């Protein structure tokens, strides 16, 4: 995202809600329609049995009739369309929309964490049971939130986190404000480096600190002062050093890269996931397909920025760069999809208000995907890129019982995914 900034007030009311939402463990779920995301076929009258200890599915079978006196750990969704919990592969849950970067100079990690708790709850209730959070300015806020959710202290989606950005001085991952260059506090410059050896050390720091993946800023950014989206920032040598270090432990590396050259350099350096990919060219598309690299193309938020940017306090520089990248990114999304490149669902939540994640589905279908392909991008394909393809993304025996339910068929109307009626994560109904 890298980034205009965020509102740090107006969160206290939600903190209580995020940390104390009541949930109920389920052992049997009766789904009138259950989507097989591989085939696109709806199974009728599916009974999902859940192991209450592991939160995983024991069995998916059929039922003839739903009992009129179900126990409290059974759920009747016989009039609903059920599908796997959704996965957003590009979020910034600890941040809210605003336009004043200077606030990052004084906000504490505790204040940032309060914002994250509120947004985690909102995101889960929108049907997203897993997110890949791809960077925070206040280092390790995301890890603390992840751990609270795992411990059931806080309500939210399953989180995979980056810890902090790896970026060059003054790059797209820096909070650099004209006139305040000398005032940037050290605690929001944890991932700033220059040179292959320095970036290797930063990668070690991310890994040893307990992050799930590494996020590096290979190109300039739309929402950062003086940073040009089409221009490379990290060198191939710097990127390679990070990838080499990551390979030692099997941790995955994803690269923020708008520009065509940056995308190709990142792929050739061994990165397996590209964020944004706005200006990707034909050679980059071919390289991505050949090397099994996934693209996370946030094709919704350009409209939000264009419509609300001034209200949110964004400077004209950011708005201009957004105008220059929005439509070309959508055209390249269509080209990459037609070429058979793996595209995952990722929205850059935090650029727009959290909870609106599902609005991106209709943009993906407008620009070349079928409804089923867009759903697959947010389920089975995303789980593959996360390395969790045997745990999430499908409603099958042995998988976590992550299930959402809605009243209308999303294969007919993709916007149905913007109105989720029930959210179940690891067998818990929220």
Segments (PLM) and residue ranges:
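Metal-associated gating/positioning segment near the N- to mid-region
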Residues: 80-147, 151-153, 169-170, 237, ...
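Histidine-rich, glycine-flanked metal-binding segment
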Residues: 27, 34, 38-83
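Histidine/acidic residue-rich metal-binding segments in metalloenzymes
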Residues: 144, 198-218, 222-294, 323-343, ...
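His/Asp/Glu-enriched, well-ordered alpha-helical/loop segment
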Residues: 106, 248, 317, 324-409
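Bacterial Sec-dependent N-terminal signal peptides
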Residues: 1-25
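Histidine/acidic-residue-rich catalytic or RNA/ligand-binding cores of hydrolases
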Residues: 98-101, 142, 225-226, 263-269, ...
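Divalent metal-dependent hydrolysis catalytic cores, especially in the metallo-beta-lactamase
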Residues: 116-140, 155-165, 211-222, 252, ...
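Active-site gating loops and adjacent loop-to-helix segments of metal-dependent hydrolytic enzymes
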Residues: 95-112, 172-188, 222-235, 294-326
């Amino acid at each position: 995202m890298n980034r205009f900034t965020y509102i740090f007030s107006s969160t206290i009311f939600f903190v209580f809600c995020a940390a104390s939402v009541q949930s109920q463990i389920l052992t049997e779920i009766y789904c009138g329609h259950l989507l097989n995301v591989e085939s696109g076929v709806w199974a009728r009258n599916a009974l999902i049995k859940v192991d209450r200890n592991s939160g995983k599915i024991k069995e998916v079978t059929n039922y003839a009739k739903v009992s009129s006196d179900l126990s409290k750990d059974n759920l009747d969704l016989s009039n609903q369309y059920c599908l796997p919990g959704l996965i957003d592969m590009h979020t910034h849950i600890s941040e809210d929309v605003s336009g004043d970067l200077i606030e990052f100079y004084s906000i504490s990690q505790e204040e940032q964490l309060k914002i994250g708790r509120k947004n985690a709850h909102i995101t889960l209730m929108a049907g997203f049971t897993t997110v890949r959070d791809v960077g925070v300015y206040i280092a390790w806020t995301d890890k603390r939130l992840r751990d609270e959710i795992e411990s059931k202290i806080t309500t939210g989606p399953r989180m995979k986190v980056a810890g902090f950005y790896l970026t060059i001085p003054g790059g797209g991952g820096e909070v650099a404000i004209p006139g305040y260059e000398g005032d940037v506090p050290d605690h929001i410059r944890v991932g700033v480096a220059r040179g292959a050896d320095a970036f290797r050390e930063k990668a070690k720091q991310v890994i040893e600190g307990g992050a799930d993946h590494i996020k590096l800023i290979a190109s300039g950014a739309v929402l950062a002062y003086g940073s040009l989206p089409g221009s490379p920032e990290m060198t191939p040598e710097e990127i390679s050093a990070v990838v080499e270090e990551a390979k030692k432990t099997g941790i995955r590396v994803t690269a923020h890269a708008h520009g065509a050259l940056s995308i190709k350099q990142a792929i050739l350096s061994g990165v397996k996931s590209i964020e944004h990919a706005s200006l990707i060219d034909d050679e980059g598309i071919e390289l991505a397909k050949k090397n099994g690299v996934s693209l996370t193309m946030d094709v919704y938020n350009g409209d939000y920025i264009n419509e609300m940017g001034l209200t949110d306090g964004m400077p004209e520089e950011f708005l201009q760069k957004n105008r220059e990248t929005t439509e070309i990114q959508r055209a390249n999304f269509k080209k990459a999809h037609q070429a058979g490149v793996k595209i995952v669902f990722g929205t850059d939540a935090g650029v727009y208000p959290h909870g609106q994640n599902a609005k991106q589905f209709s943009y993906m279908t407008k620009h070349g995907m079928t409804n089923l392909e867009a759903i697959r991008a947010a389920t089975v394909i995303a789980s593959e890129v996360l390395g969790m393809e045997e745990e999430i993304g499908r409603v099958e025996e042995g998988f976590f019982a992550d299930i959402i339910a809605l009243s209308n068929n999303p294969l007919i109307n993709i916007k149905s995914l913007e109105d989720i009626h029930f959210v179940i994560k690891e067998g818990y109904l929220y």
